[in-house]
Design a protein with these regions (language model features):
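N-terminal helix-turn-helix DNA-binding core of bacterial DNA-binding proteins
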Residues: 2-44, 69-80, 84
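Histidine-centered divalent metal-coordination motifs
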Residues: 19, 50-51
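Alpha-helical residues within the helix-turn-helix
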Residues: 39, 50, 56-57
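Conserved H-loop
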Residues: 47
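Beta-hairpin "wing" of winged helix-turn-helix
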Residues: 56-67, 73
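C-terminal structural segments of small proteins and small subunits
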Residues: 79-103
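Generic C-terminal helix-cap and adjacent flexible tail
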Residues: 105-109
């Protein structure tokens, strides 16, 4: 089986709405346990664990075991492949906004 490119792994991990919500909650919390993630989520602990596994494999979170608990925190550098990919389109958007600015000035000098 061919290795997944980092951008593919990140996009696949964040493509699932529940997984995105888990990731966002980790980001907001700084560091959080599976039990805390499960509480109030409407998702089983087993499902949360599977989502965490996908996020870890994509390099988006890291796990820190402490006693009987495992604490999860986001890895901001895990989003770099996505940011790099999006950066390639920055010129496209800058050009489009420049064209829009020109058009607006022509319409309403």
């Amino acid at each position: 089986m061919p290795a997944t490119a980092p951008i593919d792994a990140v996009m696949q991990a964040l493509a699932v709405p529940t997984r995105r919500a888990v990731f966002e909650r980790i980001v907001r919390s700084g560091e959080i346990t599976v039990v805390e993630l499960t509480r109030g989520s409407g998702v089983t602990q087993g499902a949360i664990s599977q989502h965490l596994k996908s996020l870890k494999l994509a390099g988006l979170v890291v796990e820190r075991p402490e006693g009987r608990n495992a604490y999860y925190r986001a890895r901001p550098e895990g989003l770099e492949p996505l940011a790099d990919w999006m950066g390639h389109y920055g010129a496209f958007w800058r050009d489009r906004f420049a064209d829009l600015r020109t058009l607006l000035k022509e319409i309403d000098p």
